[in-house]
Amino acid sequence: MSGVARDELRVKSTSEIFTPTPLVQEVLDQTPEKYFTDPSETVCDPSCGDGQFLGEVLIRRIENGIEFEQALSTIYGVDILEDNVELCRKRLLGKNRHLEHIVEKNIVCADALRYHYRFDGTDPYKTAKDMQFDKLFG
């Protein structure tokens, strides 16, 4: 369940809809296993919200033996609302505050339809089409 208060006015003004956890798990259960077992695979959620999908991806990667820092460093997200971005970052970090620099670069507040996907020093003029993510959710 999401950590942001979802009053009727906010939902109406932002059109945000959050994916229930059972549906997130069902979608990920149908995702090829390599996205959870290969530490070099990258994942991006262009409408990450509070991190439902990305958090579950991180959990599955760790359960498959990928070190936390490596798993975290290949997960990317974009959301248009700052409070969602903050919640996503917190969800992914847990108690690992010393890795905050990773989520500050990889989880960004922007309009995913207009964002140039500049993560961690990549070319700011690349478009989403030009970026090479191994798996996109959202």
For each feature predicted by the language model, list its residue ranges.
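SAM-dependent methyltransferase catalytic region
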Residues: 1-138
